[in-house]
């Protein structure tokens, strides 16, 4: 299966946390355009604002496993090397405090304007 096929599948079957965050992002609460399940290099990122070079990742439970932590750190560094800022949230953070998550994203976007 090709990367673009995986991205399309991920769009069709988002996690509850991804779905909730997308509902808020899509409603333009952040005043910038985001894409979801977007391919950057060899990666599919959950959300990206190309204009601001900001990637948002929403991590499920398996991201706390040692091997996955190492992969995530490498991936984050690779994205940073390409000029992107990366914010990671746990599923439970998005589901339990969507206002707090949106505020962190807004703060990051505002810092990019300075």
List the model feature ranges, each with a label.
Residues 1-32, 81, 112-114:
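Solvent-exposed, charged helical/coil patches
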Residues 36-38:
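Short acidic-hydrophobic surface loop/beta-edge motif
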Residues 10-14, 41-109:
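Basic, amphipathic alpha-helical patches used to engage nucleic acids or provide basic targeting signals
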